[in-house]
């Protein structure tokens, strides 16, 4: 999964924590 500040997939929500808004937001 992606860390905060990394680019992410808004559809799959592939962040370790928090939410995805083009980048992961803790």
Swiss-Prot record:
Record's keyword annotation contains Disulfide bond: yes
Positions carrying Glutamic acid 1-amide: 26
Compartments where located: Secreted
Any one GO MF annotation of this record: sodium channel inhibitor activity
Main location: secreted
Superkingdom in the source lineage: Eukaryota
Family to which this protein belongs: Belongs to the conotoxin O1 superfamily.
Domain notes: The presence of a 'disulfide through disulfide knot' structurally defines this protein as a knottin.
Designated name of the protein: Delta-conotoxin Am2766
Origin species: Conus amadis (Amadis cone)
Lineage, opening ranks: Eukaryota, Metazoa, Spiralia, Lophotrochozoa, Mollusca
């Amino acid at each position: 999964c992606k860390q905060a500040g990394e680019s992410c997939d808004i559809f799959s929500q592939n962040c370790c924590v928090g939410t995805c808004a083009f980048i992961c937001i803790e």
